[in-house]
C-alpha cells in the first residue's frame, strides 16, 4: 500500500499496520500530530494510558475485515524462529536474548499458587453476536464477566489447572467506572496478591486488542485451526525505553519467545508477532509477567475462546518445565 511522509512522526513513512496502531492509541495519535505527554523515570503508569479513553466507533459487519497477521513486513524483526514488532528505540538481539533465557522458576503446585491472572482493562469485550447479545458499557465493552475478557481468563485458568498449574484468577474490574488509572489499580491489587501468596512468580494480564484503520475498517486477527475459526494471540513485552526502571525486561522477552515458538510449533499462525513497547505495563513485578492480547474487538467471543484454549495448552507445556 502506498505510504506518505505525512503518515509518520518525524517524517518517516509508516506501513499499513503501523498506521492502524497509530489510529488505535490516543497517545500515539497525539505523537503523530506532534503532541506527546512526557514521562519521568519515576512514572509508573504506562504512557499509553495517560489521557487515553477507550473510544471506539460502533462496529458494523460491512466494516470488519479478517486478517492473519504473520509479521512479514519490513517493520518486523524475524530471527531464531521469532517474529517481533519492535515499537521502541532499542536494538534487539533476539539470538542473545534467547541464549540468556529467562530465570522464571515455580515451586511445586502443592506449595501454593504459581500464576496470577488478571485483567487491567476488565470490561474489554468482543463483537456482538445476535444469538447471544450482551449489554454494552461502551463499544465492545461490558461489565458482564460472561462476555468480556474475564470469560477468556476463566477458560485459560481452567485449562492451566487441568494441566497441573495452580492459578489465582482475579475477576475484579479495574477500568470501570473510571478507565484512566486502571494500571495503577491493577498494580495495587497484584501487590496484595504477591504479599499474600509468595509462591506467585507470574502475572498474566489478559486483554483483547483493537485494530482500526483510518477509514474505520475493523481488522480482526483470525485463522482456521482444525476447521475452527480461531482468534490469534499476541504477547506484549514491556521495557525501560520510556525511562522507568526495568533492568530485566530481556528475561520477559526470552519467555515470550519460548511461548510464541511453542504456540506456532503446535498450531502454526496462532501467535501474532510479539510486540515490544516502551512502557513496563507492571511487568516489573515478577520474573514471569507478560501482557497477552487475545483477538481484537472485531473477533467474536467464540473465536477468542478458541484462541485462548490453544494458548493455554501451549503455554502450560512451557511453564510446567519450570516447576520443581
PLM segments and residue spans:
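Active-site-adjacent mobile loop/cap segments within catalytic or ligand-binding domains
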Residues: 271-324
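Glycine- and acidic-residue-enriched helix-capping/strand-helix junction motifs
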Residues: 128-151
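Extracytoplasmic
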Residues: 101, 110-113, 198-201, 228-232, ...
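Catalytic-core regions of hydrolytic enzymes
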Residues: 143-222
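Solvent-exposed loop/turn segments at secondary-structure junctions
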Residues: 122-125, 173-177, 208-213, 240-243, ...
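Active-site-adjacent substrate-binding region
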Residues: 248-275
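A short, glycine/acidic-enriched catalytic loop
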Residues: 136-139, 211-247
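Non-catalytic propeptide/linker segments at domain boundaries
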Residues: 7, 11-120, 125-129
Amino acid at each position: 500500500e502506498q505510504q506518505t511522509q505525512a503518515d509518520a512522526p518525524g517524517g518517516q513513512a509508516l506501513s499499513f499496520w503501523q498506521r492502524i496502531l497509530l489510529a488505535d492509541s490516543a497517545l500515539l495519535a497525539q505523537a503523530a500530530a506532534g503532541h506527546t505527554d512526557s514521562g519521568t523515570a519515576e512514572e509508573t503508569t504506562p504512557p499509553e494510558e495517560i489521557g487515553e479513553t477507550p473510544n471506539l466507533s460502533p462496529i458494523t459487519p460491512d466494516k470488519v475485515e479478517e486478517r492473519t497477521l504473520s509479521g512479514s513486513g519490513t517493520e518486523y524483526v524475524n530471527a531464531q524462529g521469532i517474529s517481533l514488532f519492535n515499537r521502541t528505540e532499542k536494538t534487539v538481539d533476539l539470538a542473545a536474548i534467547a541464549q540468556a533465557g529467562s530465570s522464571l522458576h515455580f515451586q511445586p503446585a502443592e506449595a501454593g499458587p504459581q500464576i496470577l491472572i488478571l485483567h487491567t482493562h476488565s470490561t474489554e469485550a468482543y463483537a456482538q453476536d445476535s444469538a447471544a447479545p450482551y449489554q454494552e458499557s461502551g463499544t465492545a465493552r461490558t461489565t458482564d464477566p460472561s462476555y468480556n475478557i474475564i470469560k477468556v481468563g476463566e477458560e485459560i485458568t481452567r485449562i492451566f489447572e487441568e494441566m497441573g498449574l495452580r492459578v489465582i484468577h482475579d475477576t475484579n474490574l479495574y477500568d470501570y467506572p473510571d478507565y484512566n488509572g486502571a494500571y495503577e489499580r491493577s498494580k495495587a491489587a497484584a501487590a496484595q496478591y504477591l504479599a499474600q501468596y509468595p509462591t506467585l512468580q507470574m502475572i498474566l494480564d489478559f486483554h483483547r486488542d483493537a485494530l482500526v484503520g483510518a477509514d474505520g475498517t475493523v481488522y480482526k486477527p483470525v485463522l482456521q485451526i482444525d476447521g475452527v475459526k480461531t482468534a490469534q494471540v499476541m504477547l506484549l513485552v514491556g521495557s525501560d525505553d520510556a525511562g522507568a526502571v526495568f533492568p530485566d525486561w530481556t528475561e520477559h522477552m526470552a519467555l515470550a519467545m519460548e511461548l510464541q515458538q511453542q504456540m506456532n510449533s503446535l498450531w502454526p499462525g496462532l501467535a501474532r508477532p510479539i510486540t515490544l513497547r516502551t512502557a513496563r505495563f507492571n511487568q516489573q513485578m515478577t520474573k514471569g509477567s507478560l501482557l497477552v492480547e487475545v483477538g481484537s474487538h472485531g473477533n467474536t467471543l467464540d473465536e477468542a475462546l478458541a484462541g485462548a484454549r490453544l494458548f493455554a495448552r501451549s503455554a502450560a507445556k512451557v511453564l510446567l518445565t519450570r516447576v520443581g
